[in-house]
Amino acid sequence: MKRNLVTLALALGIAVLLFFVLRLEKQRAAGANCRLVYWNIQNGMWDGQNDNYDRFVAWVREKQPDICVWAEAQSIYYTDSDRPMRPDEQYLVAHWSELAARYGHPYVYIGGQRDDFPQAITSTHPIDNIDRIIGNGADSVVLHGCGWAQIKFRGKRLNIVTLHLAPHQWAPGLPSDEARKASAERCEGDKYRRMEIQYICEHTVATHPEAGDEYWMMMGDFNSRSRADNAFYRYPDNDTKLYVHDYIASQTPYLDALLEKHPGEMHVTMHYPARLDYVYMTRPLLERTVECRVCHDFYTEPVRDPQQLSNFWRPSDHRPIVVDFKL
């Protein structure tokens, strides 16, 4: 009897703790009046296709964001399957306006698209396209595209750059396993991402000489590691895996929001111990950032697909990042 009471008390204690944790997750940081949610929703929120995205919509509504940025924003595979959809059967990107309206966002923007992995922005405020970037089609191809949009919020113009850098250890477009292996040994995937980030920055933030005094943010799945986390990774100082974020740190006015808000901490954004997702900001916007955190809750915790389909996870192989601003 005594053991049962102890077990019951422990269970109640855990339930109360989880209640307050989840309640805190829903609330904005004190003083914040604008919330951004960024998330790579793997394969166009494939996990949400079997319930008409009801759980996804409910989660977004709970967070009450003003701006959302979604990476991998296109439907690709049939429900509970790894069979590619026919283009005419893909719900997203064509119906993002319909889906976003369900969580209270009447405005939708799709960035530059050249394959099945574009990024989308949805918002409570109008979104203006500045540029959709896919590269020059020759020596500089931005594999998954990039978007540069502006949103005016409380009289402040926010520049938002969305991206999703190339995913593999090898360079894109190679025809055989042998060629890909040789490319990976030459670290050509890292070098390709370094080319992409330079091209993106040169065509966005670098076009504004005064960007360091403006409100800019750049976010997405960078598929690369940061030197700021290298106490955790322990890569050699000259490792090519660090190229992308070294470029951002040395050549742009951007600052790593998670690092600035939580110095010295490692914030995992994947289903394995790594941070591939980042939100970068210029100093003026960072100074108006009340909180930036990786979201951990029941819904967003990555769970391997029970069928072991490809590399599919539910609801995604990435975790969201939530940012609260006082604008």
Predicted regions and their residues:
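Metal-dependent phosphoester-hydrolase catalytic domains
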Residues: 7, 132-133, 206-217, 223-327
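Short catalytic/ligand-binding loop motif for oxyanion handling, primarily in non-cytosolic enzymes
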Residues: 45-46, 76-79, 116-120, 168-171, ...
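Active-site-proximal beta-strand elements of phosphoester/diester hydrolases
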Residues: 33-46, 133, 157-167, 182-186
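Active-site beta-strand/loop signature of hydrolases that rely on acidic residues for catalysis
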Residues: 35-41, 59-86, 122, 149, ...
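N-terminal, active-site-proximal structural segment of metallo-dependent hydrolase catalytic domains
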Residues: 2-102, 113-116, 317, 324-327
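Soluble or luminal CAZymes and related metallo-dependent hydrolases
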Residues: 48-55, 88-92, 141-144, 185-201, ...
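Structured beta-strand-rich core segments of catalytic domains in phosphoester-bond hydrolases
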Residues: 71-170
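A solvent-exposed, charged loop/short amphipathic helix patch at secondary-structure junctions
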Residues: 170-191
